[in-house]
Amino acid sequence: MTNIRKMHPLMKIMNSSFIDLPAPSNISSWWNFGSLLGACLAIQIITGLFLAMHYTADTATAFSSVTHICRDVNQGWIIRYIHANGASMFFMCLFIHVGRGMYYGSFTLSETWNIGIILLFTVMATAFMGYVLPWGQMSFWGATVITNLLSAIPYIGTSLVEWIWGGFSVDKATLTRFFAFHFILPFIITALVMVHLLFLHETGSNNPLGTTSDSDKIPFHPYYTIKDLLGLLFLLLLLMMLVLFSPDLLGDPDNYTPANPLITPPHIKPEWYFLFAYAILRSIPNKLGGVLALIMSILILAILPLLQTTKQRSMVFRPFSQIMFWTLTADLFTLTWIGGQPVEYAFVIIGQIASILYFSLILIIMPTVSLIENNMLKW
């Protein structure tokens, strides 16, 4: 009798995706982050659902409903902090996942890569709207500043901003629709994740060498299920240490002050995971130029396959490309730091240099270095 997991229509899909899936025998721990992102998404949806049971999307009661969750709801404080810090874990895994794709040349799997970019934008939109919901000072002013960027679009900008706001300023209508979108988007993300996996399983995973793995595959279970489980334990350990020891480490103290349209905080800034893009936005004096640079800082990932000049897919045997990759990583850390600093002369200059370096590395320096390495292979 054939095993039920190979015969049952539903079990068959699960089996071919997570049990009998042929996987490369040499994929390293950098390949763990896909499953960790799935775990983060599950954690966020579950904790978010419980928070939504007690939250009220109304300007008069939103702030106090979050306070009520933390003070009066059974284990409400831990659910709230797991959700807030879970977002940070989500983005940490996302950035490593994208970095892994760049380093090992996974962007050559174009459908998977492009769905991944759409996922990145969707997750960023979801996180932004979630940050607005507690209706603290930084929530309100962050929403005002970021949505106002759309007014830079010629002709329709102002109308578009007022349409998104549902009025002439960020108010009750804005909060209500942001809550509605914040609730529905994670389910859209889940659907996109399924499409992402569908395309990945069409071609099979890349591996650290960047070579084809067809001749050497192993079953996903038990080898990679155990490996993913270990990664998940590390993730949960890190998340719970953050939640239980310093839950406000990555947050902003201004968000513990209820939103007040009459008082502007001294320094408006988004959460840490948006700071690199925020620094690029601020480094360009022109509003429209800044918005375009902001969008391009993420959208530039889509043209990576066109910029590939190397004969080797992975960077494992390309030391100069490795140096450029880690320079790019350091540059992103610099941009993140600058995004959190006030707009003062020294910080502005550093931000502008880091922004120019970011685009130069991806568009010019890395493809050029790859060409040089190609020529060195002939020696």
UniProtKB/Swiss-Prot annotation:
List of residues binding heme b b562: H83, H182
Cellular component, GO, one term: mitochondrial inner membrane
Gene Ontology terms describing biological process: mitochondrial electron transport, ubiquinol to cytochrome c
Cofactor: heme b
Alphabetized SUPFAM superfamilies for the sequence: a domain/subunit of cytochrome bc1 complex (Ubiquinol-cytochrome c reductase), Transmembrane di-heme cytochromes
Binding positions (heme b b566): H97, H196
Keyword NAD recorded: no
GO molecular function: metal ion binding; ubiquinol-cytochrome-c reductase activity
Alphabetical list of InterPro entries matching this protein: Cyt_b/b6_C, Cyt_b/b6_C_sf, Cyt_b/b6_N, Cytb/b6-like_sf, Cytochrome_b, Cytochrome_b_C_euk/bac, Cytochrome_b_N_euk/bac, Di-haem_cyt_TM
Transmembrane segments: 33-53, 77-98, 113-133, 178-198, 226-246, 288-308, 320-340, 347-367
Protein name: Cytochrome b
Species this protein is from: Mirza coquereli
Gene, per the UniProt record: MT-CYB
